[in-house]
Regions:
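Pre-Walker A (Motif I) flank of P-loop NTPase domains
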Residues: 1-5, 68-70
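ATP-dependent NMP and nucleoside kinases share a basic, alpha-helical "lid"
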Residues: 40, 66, 79-121, 134-139
């Protein structure tokens, strides 16, 4: 059986370093990196070129190696379900026994940005925001046999985030009566009173923390928090929260956002996780 390892993480989260360490113990593993292919095709890893061409070549080489029973590390950001879906489907459809592992490098955003500034090739700040807005925590039904989270929680990061949430104040949106802190606390207490599973309760406490990064205002001065759930999910991972907490937070807005499409996501997430998502979603609604 060969191994397919997909790295998942923001720029400067440590994907290259993780791959190098892994290779020391597993020297026959092939590493395919989107940055390396950009450099190969265009002479510069920062040259975006044609993403379709880059990833088609990356997928082709990956599948070829797996057919030869070689282990592969697939090194790209892979932050969204859409980013991961194509290659995972192709690997699953190989007439080979392949173990598929997802490695999430949930390095604190602050650390990623510090590392980024120290690199020769600096990724613009807006790219971090774009990737966080697209962040979708992996789930097993995507095709993974195993998902691991690698992080280094830093107490000052949690203190900074909690302070901002506590002092955030009025959410400036007619759908929210309570402050951000009060809303999250009410959601948490509601789930506690229902004797919900512990991961669901904790997800309720943190589910909207991403709003501290995503507040925008419309022409009438009403605040909106688009993709806040994606930010919240990553924040939980970087603070040392569990994979399931991040999954619940990431997908608790699905019943709002995919009217008529719930059945698709119900199948994708699996019945057990979907029921927990609905539990969190309902508590969130009632805590407004």
């Amino acid at each position: 059986m060969s191994n397919f390892i997909m790295l998942i993480g923001l720029p400067a989260s440590g994907k290259d370093a993780w791959a190098k360490e892994y290779i020391k113990e597993h020297p026959n593993t092939q590493v395919y990196s989107s940055d390396d292919i950009r450099k190969e095709l265009y002479g510069d890893a920062s040259h975006q070129g044609s993403p379709a061409k880059i990833f088609e070549l990356m997928r082709s080489r990956t599948l070829s190696s797996l057919r030869e029973d070689k282990d592969v590390i697939y090194n790209a950001t892979n932050v969204s379900f859409k980013d991961r879906r194509g290659i995972l489907s192709q690997v699953k459809n190989l007439k080979k026994e392949v173990k598929i592992t997802g490695i999430i490098l949930a390095t604190p955003l602050k650390v990623c940005k510090e590392r980024n500034c120290a690199r020769e090739r600096v990724v613009p700040n807006f790219v971090f925001n774009k990737m966080l807005s697209r962040w979708q925590t992996p789930f097993y039904n995507e095709g993974f046999n195993e998902i691991k989270v690698i992080t280094d929680p830093q107490s000052e990061v949690a203190k900074e985030y909690s302070g901002k949430v506590f002092h955030f104040g009025d959410q400036k949106n007619p759908h929210h009566t309570f402050s951000l802190y009060e809303h999250c606390l009410r959601c948490y207490m509601s789930l506690i009173s229902q004797k919900a599973p512990v991961e669901v309760c904790l997800a309720g406490l943190f589910h909207d923390w991403g709003k501290i990064f995503t507040q925008t205002f419309d022409e009438e001065g009403i605040a909106h928090y688009y993709q806040h759930e994606n930010y919240s999910a990553y924040m939980v991972l970087e603070m040392g929260g569990s994979l399931e907490m991040a999954q619940l937070i990431n997908y608790h807005m699905l019943p709002y956002n995919y009217k008529g499409g719930e059945a698709t996501w119900r199948v994708r997430l699996g019945e057990e996780l979907w029921q927990k998502v609905l539990m969190l979603h309902q508590a969130d609604k009632e805590a407004h």
